[in-house]
Structures are given as C-alpha cells and as structure tokens.
Amino acid sequence: MLMPKKVKHRKQMKGRMSGTPQRGVSLAFGDYGLQATECGWLDSRQIEAARIAMNRYIKRGGKIWIRIFPDKPLTAKPAETRMGKGKGSPDSWVCVIKPGRILYEMEGVTEEVAREAFRLAAHKLPIPTKFTSRKDANEG
C-alpha cells in the first residue's frame, strides 16, 4: 500500500475539501487521463485496486502514472471502546481529492483501450470521474 515513509505529525485534523486544486489539473506525462469531477478521499487500497484493474486490462501494452499519493493519516479507535480517552491511533492513509484533479495517466495504447481501462478503474473509486486526453485539452 502507498504511505509516507516518515511524517512530521502522526495525526492530522479532518480538514475541509472546498475549492479547486492549484496543481495537478492538466496532463503532464501521458496522452490520456482520469480526472475527478467531485471532491472526496481516496484510500491507499482504492488507489491500488484501480491501478491493478487498469494493468490487468492493458496487460503489457502501455505505461500508467499514478498522479496522487495518500499523505493524510486517518485515525480509528478500537471496536467496542467507550467514547473519549483521546484520539485513536493512525489506521489508514488517504489522499484528499478536489474536482479537476488528474488521478491517473496512460500512454502507449489506443484511445478505446484507455477509455475501457479507465472505466474499469473508475468502478473501484468512490468519486465520480471523467476521461480526458491531450486532444481534448488542445481543443478546449
């Protein structure tokens, strides 16, 4: 699973997901991309599940870039524990996603293959996404 090697603070506040991202909204590496249309949290397991779904479909056909990284710790208290007694221990890692953020990029495959691979990956994610390409970015 994706997670930071070392962090300054073990626990973080929840925070808010308002606004649009400052960077990561345009294709940087590949020809096709999967772009988020709403905000949300992506768990490291969800990021990995989507990556595996894409890799299984394209086999050895192209290259995939993961443009997001889970750097926010989520805490959880043990089961059947009474309320209070402090914040729980770090349980998993999430990535804060804002609308417009590019999640994955791909190159070396046809557009039809990329569309289908991203469709399979989108089923593994809890946020709505859309397909983007360099061709669309140049026209718009």
UniProtKB/Swiss-Prot annotation:
GO terms for molecular function: rRNA binding; structural constituent of ribosome; tRNA binding. GO terms for cellular component: cytosolic large ribosomal subunit. Residues 1-14 have a biased composition (Basic residues). One of its GO terms (biological process) is translation. Residues 1-20 are annotated as: Disordered. Keywords: Ribonucleoprotein, Ribosomal protein, RNA-binding, rRNA-binding, tRNA-binding. Binds 23S rRNA and is also seen to make contacts with the A and possibly P site tRNAs. The gene is rplP. HAMAP family: Ribosomal_uL16. This is Large ribosomal subunit protein uL16. Part of the 50S ribosomal subunit. Belongs to the universal ribosomal protein uL16 family. It holds the Pfam family Ribosomal_L16. InterPro entries: Ribosomal_uL16 (IPR047873), Ribosomal_uL16_bact-type (IPR000114), Ribosomal_uL16_CS (IPR020798), Ribosomal_uL16_dom (IPR016180), Ribosomal_uL16_sf (IPR036920). It comes from the Bacteria.
